[in-house]
Amino acid sequence: MVVGLLGGSFDPPHAGHVHISLEALKRFRLDRVWWLVSPGNPLKPRPPAPLPARLAEARRLMRHPRVVVTDIEARLGTRFTAETLAALRARYPGVRFVWLMGADNLAQFHRWDRWQGIMRTVPVGVLARPGAGLRSRTSPAARIYARARVGAADLAAARPPAWCFLNLPMVDLSSTAIRATGRWR
């Protein structure tokens, strides 16, 4: 079983999250995608909407038999991705995990706690986001791990460090823009 992990605040979840999840299932040859709705992001200056509201909206929006919306990070008590990955790998030893992120996150991945450990632990699938292509492909992480880049169809079986940048048709939505309209919270 190969599970893609899409971590995020999902504040709010939107059609762009759905789109990249379905593309990741198909192009990275994943069996499942788990939306890890985070209790909070240590790199963001303001707290997100309450977790129950974000979970409920994510479950309403993402209705696919191979995508699971979960609050497992809150239940595990993990705060950083590296901790979450360690806990999930211990809890599910037979599952192969692939970390999924938008290109905007790759651009600042080097700021994450133990980011190089994440790269050495699981394959990483990076999905294009509007306006983030060049910044992500020239980021410190992309430069340091340039030789570890693999094709989309090979990512799930690749031995870490391995990563793939997936160009795909993009949905021009962002949680930040949705919040700015006042349609959320």
Curated annotation (Swiss-Prot):
Provide the reaction this enzyme catalyses.
Answer: nicotinate beta-D-ribonucleotide + ATP + H(+) = deamido-NAD(+) + diphosphate
Q: Which UniProt keywords apply?
A: ATP-binding, NAD, Nucleotide-binding, Nucleotidyltransferase, Pyridine nucleotide biosynthesis, Transferase
Q: Which GO terms describe its biological process?
A: NAD biosynthetic process
One Pfam family named in its UniProt record:
CTP_transf_like
Q: In which pathway does it act?
A: Cofactor biosynthesis; NAD(+) biosynthesis; deamido-NAD(+) from nicotinate D-ribonucleotide: step 1/1
- Return one GO MF term: ATP binding
Superkingdom, taxonomy of origin: Bacteria
Q: Which InterPro entries match?
A: Cyt_trans-like (IPR004821), NadD/NMNAT (IPR005248), Rossmann-like_a/b/a_fold (IPR014729)
The EC number(s) given in the record are 2.7.7.18
Q: Which Gene3D superfamilies match?
A: HUPs (3.40.50.620)
Give the protein family. Belongs to the NadD family.
Q: Which NCBIfam families match?
A: nicotinate (nicotinamide) nucleotide adenylyltransferase (TIGR00482), PRK00071.2-2 (NF000843)
Q: What the protein does? A: Catalyzes the reversible adenylation of nicotinate mononucleotide (NaMN) to nicotinic acid adenine dinucleotide (NaAD).
This chain's protein is named Probable nicotinate-nucleotide adenylyltransferase
* Organism of origin: Cereibacter sphaeroides (strain ATCC 17025 / ATH 2.4.3)
